[in-house]
């Protein structure tokens, strides 16, 4: 059985603050990786939080360990561009996610 997880990631030490996100090292590989997770139904929502160095993601997975393992495969994790601050189970109480039938 799967559940939803809220994930907070932040820019790591390898992030280059002088260039936009789309010009970071291995941007295309990172974007392709995240798009593949979305196509699988694992990464449900994702995006940067305005005015911060953080990114909020909503994942559907079987456990926190599964979320950690999947994010560890991202080249931006491996190369230190992003690091995970926390992963917490999330109970959606209002609205629905597209294509989601619930818990």
Language-model-detected regions and their locations in the chain:
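Conserved, structured core segments of small domains
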Residues: 1-103
């Amino acid at each position: 059985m799967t559940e939803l997880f809220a994930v907070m990631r932040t820019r790591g030490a390898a992030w280059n603050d002088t260039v936009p996100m789309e010009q970071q090292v291995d941007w295309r590989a990172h974007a392709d990786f995240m798009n593949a997770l979305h196509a699988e139904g694992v990464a449900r929502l994702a995006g940067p939080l305005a005015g911060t160095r953080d990114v909020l993601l909503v994942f559907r997975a079987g456990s926190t360990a599964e979320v950690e393992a999947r994010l560890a495969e991202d080249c931006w994790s491996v190369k230190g561009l992003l690091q995970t601050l926390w992963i917490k189970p999330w109970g959606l109480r209002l609205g629905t996610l597209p294509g989601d039938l619930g818990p």
